[in-house]
Amino acid sequence: MQALRLGPTGHERVVLFAAGAGGDPERYRPLLDQLAAHDCQVIAPCFERFVAREATTAQLLARPAGLVEALHRWAAPEADVAVVGHSIGGWAGLCLAGATPWGRDGEPMDVPREPRVSRLALYAPAAGWFAGPGALDAVTATMLVYAGEMDTITPVEQIMQLKNAPAPVDLRVVPEAGHFSFMNTPPPGTVESDGFDRARFLADLAQATAEFVTAA
């Protein structure tokens, strides 16, 4: 397994980062550098790229399974873990925290769990998978959730359902933001709304995330 690892090692505060479908944490590097600068051990596994709409069940499950493997490999057993995830990475983080996604066959999926996860910072998470009965009932990790107003991949309406979880949820809708506005290096050809200042937003996002994962 390959992973981008930053900050102190063997630390009591671990940030486990889950990239979107592209699977490359380097595309979020300034964010991860900011988290490491706030005295967090950052573990960001690299994953095979896939197209989310075409992903197989095995490809999907490889994401939360890989996150658990990375924790077991590089984090201290007693570490307090926050998962920061974008898009399908947010889906994987929710799985670890106890959410149960419902598959394309209409049945609940058996996904990996990680009881050390106490916080989730989710950017445009793929929340549509958690619309089934009781899908969010076991999620008690505190959540900071961002949704892009202009996102057509993970629409605000889908993300709003995360408020059905029993956990505290701070959900913020970002005006003019799209699905890839949360990436420091978005896919080629990405076009932002005219009124959206991505550089400023990303700086604010990194600071807010750092404050969230390090809060007492």
Language-model features, listed with the residues they occupy:
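Short substrate-entry loop that stabilizes the transition state in hydrolases
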Residues: 11-12, 17-53, 152-155
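Catalytic active-site module of serine/aspartate enzymes centered on a nucleophile-bearing elbow/loop
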Residues: 188-216
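Short alpha-helix in the alpha/beta-hydrolase fold that links the catalytic acid
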Residues: 141, 154-164
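Conserved alpha/beta-hydrolase "nucleophile elbow" surrounding the catalytic nucleophile
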Residues: 81, 85-90, 148
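Short beta-strand/loop motif that positions the catalytic acidic residue
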Residues: 139, 145-147
